[in-house]
Amino acid sequence: MGYNCINKKDLSGKVFTIPTNDANPYIKLHANINKPITAMTMCQRFNSGLERGQTLFSLATKSADNELMLYKSSLGTYRVHVRLRSLDFFNLPDGINEWISLCWTWDSKTGLTQLWLNGKRSARRVISPHGTITGEPSIVLGQDQDTYGGGFDPNQSFVGDVTDVHFWDKVLSPCDIKYYMHGQIKSPGNLLNWEALQFTTNGKVFIEKSDFIC
């Protein structure tokens, strides 16, 4: 499977647009990860017209395909995967054809995980306590990795716009997450930083201007 050359860009004010419903388009993100992940926060904004399930974030290693995976099952229902285990969150604030600001946190010490959507948070749940994510990660936007870097299913693909993707190796404070929800960043992600993003694209993926804040 070939990739285009690695880009490193400040994508402030830009979005990735994936307009087609198939297994070809995706974005591979190249993260600055040099130690095991024992806590994390991943934030992004997305806008999609799909009602079916779709994958928002997929991190695989050579030993496990669903090390970290965030899947929108249906309107208001989201599934998180950590270390091959999964949890469903229901009745979350959601919408179609509108911007959704989302953050997902997980701390291996306790296993506590939580979702934030448009400023409102879910209840905290427990998944994979004391788990550690090791090995070279493959991080993909737009598709679910059923194998390391591949195994894509078009029925789980994302169609729409995604922007402001940040990934930290810690759980952000509620105040920092609320800043993000309002379009501000106190400190960019140290693993993935939208303002200095390293990425490759495959298939019909376009970089367009964002209308989240005008």
Q: For each predicted feature, which ranges?
A:
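Extracellular glycan-associated modules
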Residues: M1-C214
